[in-house]
């Protein structure tokens, strides 16, 4: 039989769990948003308390029914770090057409929530989500922080857009993210260096971290929330949001 003491014990365990420097309970809710007639499912995660809080939207990688990264775990980790987190699963199409609109719907939704400080909005993007985060930051001026992890090697990323990105940028990649089945053999490390160079040449505020080789495939470093990189993500977000 579950007792009142058991309930208190569970709450205590939740309240002392710490990730990214913030301790406290968090709440996760399922959301459904409309984007061009597509019903997109997602997870909204909130720290305990009333806010207003800074907010971060996570753009996952992959395409079609294959999801790259860990959307729900990242959402929960953001809340445990003191942010409102939103991870929205984009339309299940492999071509990227329409995916930027999905990303925009996510940011617009989080920005209008009462418990969110609309002046402190950040975006994290992994792989294809990193490409979308780049495109999104180049077209809007209301983002205060941008984290791009293992960005997809794709000619749709326009290096000339670097000058249009106002938000500070954190670029993350693993040393051995140099070609695998997940990237169709493309060299993500080399491409990320080009992204970093474009931002530097444009005079942008950029931090660029290359992590040591991760297992047999550096792209998989960001498949889960791992302390190797997450501590840098939360440090960066807290310094700008």
Question: Residue ranges of each PLM-predicted region?
Answer:
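Short substrate-entry loop that stabilizes the transition state in hydrolases
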Residues: 51-53, 61-94, 178-181
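Alpha/beta-hydrolase active-site loop
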Residues: 94-114
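Alpha/beta-hydrolase fold nucleophile elbow
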Residues: 116-127
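Short glycine-enriched nucleophile-adjacent loop
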Residues: 130-141
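Active-site-adjacent alpha-helix of alpha/beta-hydrolase-fold enzymes
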Residues: 173-207
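C-terminal catalytic histidine-bearing segment of alpha/beta-hydrolase fold enzymes
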Residues: 202-241
């Amino acid at each position: 039989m579950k007792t009142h003491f058991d309930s208190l014990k569970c709450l205590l365990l939740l309240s002392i769990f710490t990730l990214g420097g913030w301790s406290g309970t968090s709440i996760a809710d399922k959301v459904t948003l409309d984007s061009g007639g597509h019903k997109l499912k997602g997870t909204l995660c909130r720290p305990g308390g009333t806010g207003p809080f800074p907010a971060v939207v996570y753009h996952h990688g992959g395409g079609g029914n294959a999801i790259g990264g860990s959307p729900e775990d990242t959402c929960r980790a953001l809340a445990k770090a003191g942010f409102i987190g939103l991870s929205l699963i984009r339309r299940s199409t492999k071509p990227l057409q329409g995916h930027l609109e999905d990303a925009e719907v996510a940011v617009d939704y989080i920005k209008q929530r009462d418990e969110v400080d609309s002046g402190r909005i950040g975006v994290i993007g992994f792989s294809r989500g990193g490409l979308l985060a780049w495109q999104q930051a180049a077209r809007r001026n209301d983002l205060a922080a941008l984290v791009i992890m293992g960005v997809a090697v794709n000619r749709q990323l326009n290096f000339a857009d670097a000058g249009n990105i106002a938000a500070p940028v954190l670029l993350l990649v693993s040393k051995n993210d140099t070609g695998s089945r997940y990237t169709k053999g493309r060299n993500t490390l080399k491409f990320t260096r080009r992204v970093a160079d474009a931002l530097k040449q444009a005079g942008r505020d950029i931090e660029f971290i290359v992590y040591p080789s991760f297992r047999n495939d550096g792209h998989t470093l960001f498949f889960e929330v791992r302390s190797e990189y997450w501590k840098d993500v939360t440090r960066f977000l807290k310094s700008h949001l």
